Amino acid sequence: STHSDRFDLNSVYSICSYSKGELFLSQLIYLIGKENTMKTLKRYFDEFKFKHPTPNDIKRTAERVSGAELDWYLTDWTQTTNTIDYGIKDVSEANSSTNITLERIGRMPMPIDLVVEYVDGTKESFYIPLRMMFFEKENPTPEMKRTVLKDWAWAEPTFTFSIPKSKSLIKKISIDPNGFMADIKPENNSFEITK
């Protein structure tokens, strides 16, 4: 979308055209799952080989394969300087349950994969879909119990949910513990509960 001669430095052009393009595809894995992304790439190649596709073509192919709505993703990723930054804002206990409040600090919305590790060594996964995607991603960790929470509306800066367990039973809470989301400040993605 931005012509190469509009960049002041070649290195900036390289980052915007190559690195950001690579991250676009890796974020698709985070958004729609690995299997859907691989199917998308195969179908995209089959449909557009020897042609001149546009950015909308990869987005439309991913939408057809997965069923997710991805207009917002293409717009945020290619036409803005919005960043992805989520954090754990607060962890509190009430009535033998633990309330967890997450916050969207950056302007780019994303669905959230969150893992709670308990003091007994077990782990539980929570998935917070993004409302404007109209989609629920396949479970990337089928060996772990997964709870799908209500959708997070993109305009809401915070999201709070409860776990029906005491805070004393929780060891660590992590947003995207595998590091697949392009969060610019991953150090605020985990919360360790010290005794």
Feature-to-residue mapping (PLM):
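Extracellular acidic, Ser/Thr/Pro-rich low-complexity tracts
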Residues: 64-66, 104-106, 183
